[in-house]
């Protein structure tokens, strides 16, 4: 199975307990195996017991240390729109594995137990189950952020092609870098734009002359092709972020 895109979050214990609801995730199970207390390592096995492909899930991780300290965190995994479109997902009857590495808060305070609970699962038909609404919201926010970043590239290339500059790739790159300097609204939610990723996209557009040459087209033709590809990707990601929670 291909590696999922993973994010980790530290959660306050009270908040985690408050967000959990009575509706359990029924489509999959999580089991901790290969636990090594000395190293603080373990493997989480996620089994898809539903009849649908799973494209994302969120795990609540509870770690107990020797000195009775309890840490709670969340691991979110998502196959992403492109991989899912290629049929890559956690298929029915399939088991996915994820390695955990827990760091002790201080020397000698070793890990005594690790518990993993599935708190949100998203299926390929865009429906979802969740016992933690905020965990499901974070999956939606992650997917929405990806769509927003691709749309930023679409806007940059569109503006470059509509302008008068002959250096189209550099123009698109500058538009992206200027956009990154714009402060994010204070009431914005979710992870927002990844500055590192968008700088990577800007660097990609700066290489437009080389990329166009490799396709044996002009720079304008190359960016026009890329615009079509990016528009399709943005639409795919936007649809991917539209998740419906299953009743019950």
Residue locations for each model-derived region?
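Short, surface-exposed ligand- or partner-binding patches at beta-edge/loop junctions that are enriched
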Residues: 106-125
């Amino acid at each position: 199975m291909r590696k999922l895109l993973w994010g980790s979050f530290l959660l306050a214990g009270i908040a985690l307990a408050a967000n959990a609801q009575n509706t359990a995730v029924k489509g999959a199970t999580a089991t901790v195996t290969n636990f090594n207390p000395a190293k603080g390592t373990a493997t989480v096995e996620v089994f898809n017991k539903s009849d649908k492909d799973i494209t994302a899930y969120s795990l609540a991780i509870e770690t107990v240390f020797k000195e009775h300290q309890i840490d709670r965190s969340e691991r979110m995994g998502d196959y992403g729109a492109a991989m899912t479109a290629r049929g890559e997902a956690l298929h029915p009857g399939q088991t996915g594995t994820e390695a955990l590495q827990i760091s002790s808060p201080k020397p000698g305070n070793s890990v005594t137990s690790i518990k993993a609970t599935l708190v949100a699962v998203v299926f390929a038909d865009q429906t979802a189950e969740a016992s933690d609404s905020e965990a499901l919201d974070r999956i939606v926010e992650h997917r929405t952020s990806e769509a927003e970043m691709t749309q930023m590239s679409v806007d940059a290339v569109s503006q470059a092609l509509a302008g008068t500059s002959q250096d189209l790739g550099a123009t698109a790159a500058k538009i992206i870098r200027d956009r990154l300097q714009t402060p994010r609204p204070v009431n914005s939610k979710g992870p927002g734009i990844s500055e590192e990723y968008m700088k990577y996209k800007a660097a990609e557009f700066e290489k437009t002359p080389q990329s166009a040459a490799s396709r044996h087209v002009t720079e304008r033709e190359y960016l026009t092709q890329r615009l079509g590809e990016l528009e399709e990707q943005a639409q795919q990601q936007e649809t991917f972020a539209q998740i419906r929670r299953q009743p019950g």
